[in-house]
Amino acid sequence: MPGDKVKIALLLAAALAGPVMAGELGVLKPIIKDNDALMRERPDGKGKAFVLEQVRQGKLYEALQQEARSGFTRTMLALDDLAMQVAGDPKGQTSWLMLALEDGGFARCGFWLQDGGKQRWLNECMVDLVVDQDSIADGSFEEIYAHEIGHVFLRRLLPNLPQGYSRTPHHSFSVTDQQTALDEGFATHFQAIARRFTHNQRLLAQDAGAEYKPYTPLWLSNLDRAYRIEGVRQNWFVHQQIAPPGAEDAIVRRELSTMFDRAQLKNPAQMLASEGFDATVFYRYAAVGEGGAELVRRYEPLFRALKALNAQKLATDTSLVPALAQALSGLSRADGDRFVQVLMDTSYGALASPQLAARAEALALTGRMGDGDAFVPALKAVRKEMAEQAAAAQARPAMLAEHIGPALWLLHPTLKALGGGQNDAPLAINLNTAEREHLMALPGIDAARADRLLASRQQSGSFASIDDFLQRAALSAGDAQAIRGMEGAMRAAGPYPRD
């Protein structure tokens, strides 16, 4: 709407005229009853929501307000204010933070606010996070809050984002589905942005490797946090993972692998189902330049594009990041061209051209062997082809989705996602992102047949349908029927809701 554009232009002009403007950080805490957080039925009848009261004093409250005034959180609050403006909120809402008692780290929408003896429903979003003085002092609050409020931005701008079908617990190095990858990747990139622009000396020391602890970095969640930063900076997630040796479940070892083969690329479907890859794209788009008000300004076209994407009919097979590139190009050709260039650079051109992907892999093989005679001329040739393909993609961003293929989901009748260790959901397999270990879990597929299917997918393109997969697999009638049964089971189960 023209009026909305004028309001946002005035907001940005005011921000750029001085220090970054930020909204209020409202602090909430749960009402405790019988040693547990009080919950009450939502007005729409869809489950329960927290009953909360506002915090307005105390040492922790003051430390949070100081962070909101002078830390990087100030910039995130300004971005939340921008997200509200772009989403069309005429009055502006408070950026709410709920002080979780345990197991925090969520973006939630809707809660009961108790004021005096009365409770009223607020259909507003909040970050649910465990916070203490130490987490504020060492910068971990600043970083994790940036991640969680990134989810809030998407709830405001892209509320129609569909749920995905993957049941795999998400990590920066996991391959799930495009919906989860966009949601988590967008939030994750703000952690790297927080590291880029923080002034917290302890977080800077940790980032530089000057503040550290032995042993605890080896824990899964700490590995994940580290890869959300370094993996994004080094563009690791575009590469194929290597399953480490071990006696543990083969699929689990593959999905939790933190080892990447820098001479092998993921296929386009795997890239866009990787939150680490999406995080890298968003980070590279936003990180170049000054922080503060300039950073807020850089996000405005992207926020507009997310809102435009929300107006489209989004489905399971919508290639979300390429669709976002199209939306951004439609609003601003210059910003769209820059986003497409980031996509091309980050994917080594694989999203637009399988030939470019193959040339990048060949170049990597000669490069890591130090073969200058082969590397230098190949580099010159591949750069020329990349420039041509990038120009073509900028002129027609839809081509970035042409090599992804459909999402062909199967629900395994007995195996659990990640072996059932972190959740009890059945294993879901997308045939166009599946690796050797996943295929070998299917009826009639041994190691040799799995390798042939992967080679066929790489050489002849993504599987166009279940029928196409079964034809290439050449399975017995009984095994083919079992796989069709797994397809039907997934249709019956439907998408997988995540917190």
Which positions does each model-derived feature cover?
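Active-site recognition of the HExxH zinc-binding catalytic motif
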Residues: 143-160, 184-188, 192
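Acidic/polar low-complexity interaction segments
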Residues: 23-78
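N-terminal signal peptide c-region/cleavage motif recognized by signal peptidases
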Residues: 17-19
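Small-residue hinge/turn detector
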Residues: 446-449, 476
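Residue-level signature of tetratricopeptide-repeat
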Residues: 449, 454-466
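Auxiliary, metal-adjacent structural segments of Zn-dependent hydrolase domains
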Residues: 62-130, 134-138, 142
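Alpha-helical interaction/regulatory segments in DNA maintenance proteins
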Residues: 412, 416-420, 470-499
